[in-house]
């Protein structure tokens, strides 16, 4: 597929080869996204090659890098939640390439999730493994059971992997995400640029929430000068029951 030539080249540079079915699904996803983007603001990136690099490839990189470069567990049928998924990144590309994962796409805006429900149906992403959308705020959905209404399922400490490309600072993002992670599970934060200062400012908060930074991996997207970073955090202890705090507080007053 000529339209995917650069994407395929970038994939080969990272030592993995997408199948024709995966490429077809990515193309269908792109077409659905750009069409829906005309009525609901999903992304400012709509050029096909840019979407391939900045959304598709970037979503996949942590999970396809050789383990001697980035020691992240390989995916099989683990339970994963994508917090603040937006237009479905990184969750949808990960589900396309790792179809057996049991994926929850969480966002606070129902309009985005309506789009993602359409994507799931159109791409038949529920053929293998589970996939669902979840509407709400992270501060409420990951609260301890005693703070939940009886009709709300318990999501706290129930996921093997939590991923997020949300733009919040790492301290705030950790308060959103770490409560969802099982003990010994992982939180993976995708970040733009260099993050040394941001990481240092978040170390105490991450520890307070029960996490430990395993690795910070800076990289440049293939055939570009675009700098990104991956922050890998492992859950070592249960998150104290007072976290996350009430909705809005993690962003207004980040833990330090």
Question: Where in this protein do the model-derived segments appear?
Answer:
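Class I SAM-dependent transferase core
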Residues: 2-75, 81, 111-131
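SAM/dcSAM-binding transferase cores
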Residues: 200-256
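Short "lid" loop at the C-terminus of a central beta-strand within the Rossmann-like core
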Residues: 139, 192-196, 221
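Helix-to-beta-strand junctions that scaffold the AdoMet/dcAdoMet cofactor pocket
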Residues: 181-183
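Conserved SAM/SAH cofactor-binding pocket of Class I
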Residues: 60-168, 174-177
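Residue-level signal for inorganic ion chemistry
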Residues: 33, 94, 191, 233
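Short alpha-helix immediately C-terminal to the canonical SAM-binding loop
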Residues: 112-114, 195, 199
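Short strand-turn motif at the edge of the Rossmann-like AdoMet-binding core
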Residues: 167, 190-194, 218
């Amino acid at each position: 597929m000529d339209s995917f030539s650069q994407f395929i080249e970038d994939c080969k540079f990272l030592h993995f080869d997408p199948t024709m079915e995966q490429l077809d699904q990515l193309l269908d996803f792109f077409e659905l996204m750009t069409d829906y983007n005309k009525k609901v603001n999903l992304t400012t990136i709509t050029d096909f090659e840019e979407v391939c690099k900045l959304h598709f490839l970037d979503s996949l990189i942590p999970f396809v890098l050789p383990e001697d470069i980035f020691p992240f567990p390989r995916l099989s049928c683990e339970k994963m939640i994508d917090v603040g998924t937006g237009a479905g990144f990184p969750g949808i590309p990960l589900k396309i390439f790792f179809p057996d994962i049991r994926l929850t796409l969480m966002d606070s805006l129902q309009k985005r999730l309506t789009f993602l429900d359409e994507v799931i149906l159109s791409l038949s992403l529920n053929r293998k493994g589970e996939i669902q959308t979840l509407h709400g705020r992270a501060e409420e959905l990951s609260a301890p059971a005693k703070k939940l209404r009886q009709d709300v399922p318990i999501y706290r400490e129930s996921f093997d992997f939590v991923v997020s490309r949300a733009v919040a600072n790492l301290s705030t993002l950790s308060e959103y995400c770490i409560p969802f992670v099982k003990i010994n599970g992982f939180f993976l934060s995708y970040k733009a640029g260099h993050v040394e200062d941001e990481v240092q400012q978040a170390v105490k908060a991450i520890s307070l929430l029960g996490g430990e930074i395993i690795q910070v991996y800076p990289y440049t997207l293939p055939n570009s000068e675009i700098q990104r970073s991956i922050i890998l955090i492992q859950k070592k202890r249960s998150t104290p029951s007072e976290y996350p705090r009430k909705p809005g507080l993690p962003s207004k007053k980040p833990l330090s």
